[in-house]
């Protein structure tokens, strides 16, 4: 009986420690980031320079930690079975009401590998 309680407690502890948690995003205002879906309000653009300086610290984190940190991505693109992209728009995208695009909006691209880990972080106005 004591062994089964000990095994259950250790299993629970292992399971809880394996869950992803949010990543430190430096001076980026995460509340503004999460409330600015598709970059419509322009709040994410205020943190673009800060993001550029810390973007490499997100390499290797899993997709769940990314979602817990920045919220649900504005767009997800599955390239093939081995990689996908998470898009977070810094400038208003075509999904914003009343926005007429003259150029592609600035966005953050997180490239996810087959293990759902971030393998590349890019700030660009180009599609992958």
Each model region followed by its residue ranges:
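Positively charged n-region of N-terminal signal peptides that target proteins for export
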Residues: 1-4
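Sec-dependent N-terminal signal peptides
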Residues: 6-13
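C-terminal motif of bacterial Sec signal peptides marking the signal peptidase cleavage site
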Residues: 15-18
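Residues within mature, well-folded domains
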Residues: 20-128
């Amino acid at each position: 009986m004591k062994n089964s309680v000990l095994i259950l407690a250790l299993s629970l502890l292992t399971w809880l420690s394996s869950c992803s948690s949010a990543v430190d995003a430096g001076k980026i205002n995460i509340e503004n980031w999460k409330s600015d879906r598709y970059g419509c309000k322009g709040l994410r653009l205020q943190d673009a320079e800060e993001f550029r300086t810390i973007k490499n610290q997100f390499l290797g984190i899993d997709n769940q930690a990314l979602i817990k940190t920045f919220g649900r991505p504005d767009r997800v693109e599955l390239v093939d079975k081995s990689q996908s992209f998470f898009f977070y728009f810094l400038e208003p995208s075509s999904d914003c009401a009343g926005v007429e695009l003259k150029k592609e909006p600035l966005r953050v691209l997180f490239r996810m590998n087959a293990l759902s880990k971030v393998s590349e972080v890019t700030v660009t106005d180009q599609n992958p």
